[in-house]
Amino acid sequence: SFSVNPAVEILQHRYMEKVAQNNRNFLNRV
């Protein structure tokens, strides 16, 4: 990612993991 702030890096990483998991759950339902 583009941030130099480690806390923001962690938040972005967690957000991307959550989005990826939501996408998998959505695909499994369809």
UniProtKB/Swiss-Prot annotation:
Q: Which domain of life is it from?
A: Eukaryota
Which InterPro entries is this protein grouped with? CRF
| Secreted recorded as keyword | yes
Indicate yes or no for the key word rRNA-binding. Answer: no
Which Gene Ontology molecular-function terms are recorded?
hormone activity
Localization annotation: Secreted
> Keywords, A to Z?
Amidation, Hormone, Secreted
Q: Tell me which residues bear Valine amide.
A: 30
Q: What is its main location?
A: secreted
Gene Ontology cellular component list: extracellular region
**Family per record:** Belongs to the sauvagine/corticotropin-releasing factor/urotensin I family.
Query: Briefly, what is this protein's role?
Result: Regulation of fluid secretion. May stimulate primary urine secretion by Malpighian tubules and causes a dose-dependent stimulation of cAMP levels in the tubules.
- Write down what this protein is called: Diuretic hormone 2
Query: Taxonomy-wise, where does this protein's organism fall, top ranks first?
Result: Eukaryota, Metazoa, Ecdysozoa, Arthropoda, Hexapoda
